[in-house]
Amino acid sequence: MELDAILDNLSDEEQIELLELLEEEENYRNTHLLYEFTPYSKQREFIDAGHDYQSDVLWLVTSLVSHLLALLKSRFTLPGDTRERKVIRLMVNMAESGKVSVSMSQLSSGIGGETNETVTKTTQRILCGRIEENDEPGYGSPKEDSSWEKSSVLLILLIIFSLSHHRLMVLKMHSICYFKHTRRHRHAAGDTITAYGLTKRLPYSIYAEGLTRTNKYGQFSILTFTPLMGMSDGVTKFLKNPSKSQKVVNMTIYDAEHYTDEQKEQIIASYPEHEREARARGIPTMGSGRIFQIPEETIKCQPFECPDHFYVIDAQDFGWNHPQAHIQLWWDKDADVFYLARVWKKSENTAVQAWGAVKSWANKIPVAWPHDGHQHEKGGGEQLKTQYADAGFSMLPDHATFPDGGNSVESGISELRDLMLEGRFKVFNTCEPFFEEFRLYHRDENGKIVKTNDDVLDATRYGYMMRLRQDDARY
């Protein structure tokens, strides 16, 4: 071995010194495991969100990853010295972007879970190690920089975790993290803190109480969950009606880059059939019925170049506070098969900005649009349809309807679902915004379609409705 060869050339004293250094290095690595963490693309999106949003949610399918990501953010929210700032930038490969904010002051934060057990066996274990075993380190802090106070009731439960650091390497400070279970509302209350993190599908009242603790410092909070047990009111609030300051990131098993495709399919197949969508993609159980109860694999396909004989139409759904969406639909008229080939979706973008984003594939392609394109107030002055036409879009003369003049949402969704079931509606696997909506589209307790987070689906429906009135547009 290489080490043996090196040791053979050293004196006894040098060998002892080298072995001590190697042992010290190994101990350091064991107590700084988080520094070596390299995020996957979806994890990085979650980390990035802390720069632009006050509240961000990681909606996952594996609990270990969710807790690790939550603690990643918690661990590097606490300290702020120069060494830590360099480490976090290196760790997430973002030195050039400047998107990671690291405080240079003494901070306090809170981490909550459903019960004492979920706190000790998830977030606390990952950050601090197994307290009951003493010798197993956590992924976050070196022991020499940290201290803690145990609960007098449950000895393996920490109530306060303290981390010492330096401001500008001169002034020594102590940032602290409170661990709490939140089974009862009162346990979420407490002192004013800088940041708050929650795991699992907690009631929204618990989340709101934790958020209140951070009002003074800007309401920074994070939430991670796997929606296996369905939609709690907190999950519902984030997934269906997020505010401008809230960001939701959905990470599926297909975003776990350490698994091969074969391993992913093997893992999914090992779960009971009724749990697979929740386990694999984080799709919550809809109490009143998910509309597209169709496996994604049956409609996904690899991208390909558009053949000359395909008919092509674009379509859009207007939006400002909620996202606007632009899609491109291809129709193989001979086989009567439709392909959703391109998708773009974004909030608070003008017609000119939207055109700049999709011009490369939307130029001179007819665009189907909904009836609210006749409105003036959203853009102030000209009709929305006119604004988009002036920006460069080839807007069809009339808003989207079926050939008989109707525009029923139910009819459109029913026809698209039938096409999917018959294998005649395919979606390029690059169109992730479509699948994010597809997974959650459902009916309320009265059986009506819930019209939120459906921008891409609406645009797709408009394109399908107007497929016969596109003036034979082809590439």
Curated annotation (Swiss-Prot):
Keywords: ATP-binding, Endonuclease, Hydrolase, Late protein, Magnesium, Metal-binding, Nuclease, Nucleotide-binding, Viral genome packaging, Viral release from host cell. Its EC number is 3.1.21.-, 3.6.4.-. Residues 1-282 are annotated as: ATPase activity. Residues 308-475 are annotated as: Nuclease activity. It comes from the Viruses. Nuclease activity probably requires 2 Mg(2+) ions per subunit. Residues 1-58 are annotated as: Interaction with the terminase small subunit. The keyword Cytoplasm does not apply. GO terms for molecular function: ATP binding; ATP hydrolysis activity; endonuclease activity; metal ion binding. Mg(2+) binds at D317, D455. Its cofactor is Mg(2+). The keyword Nuclease applies. Pfam families: Terminase_6C, Terminase_6N. The ATPase region is in the N-terminus, whereas the nuclease region is in the C-terminus. The terminase large subunit acts as an ATP driven molecular motor necessary for viral DNA translocation into empty capsids and as an endonuclease that cuts the viral genome to initiate and to end a packaging reaction. The terminase lies at a unique vertex of the procapsid and is composed of two subunits, a small terminase subunit involved in viral DNA recognition (packaging 'pac' sequence), and a large terminase subunit possessing endonucleolytic and ATPase activities. Both terminase subunits heterooligomerize and are docked on the portal protein to form the packaging machine. Belongs to the Lederbergvirus large terminase family. Interacts with the terminase small subunit; the active complex is composed of dimer of terminase large subunits and a nonamer ring of terminase small subunits. Interacts with the portal protein; this interaction allows the packaging of viral DNA. This is Terminase, large subunit. The lineage of its organism: Viruses, Duplodnaviria, Heunggongvirae, Uroviricota, Caudoviricetes. The gene is 2.
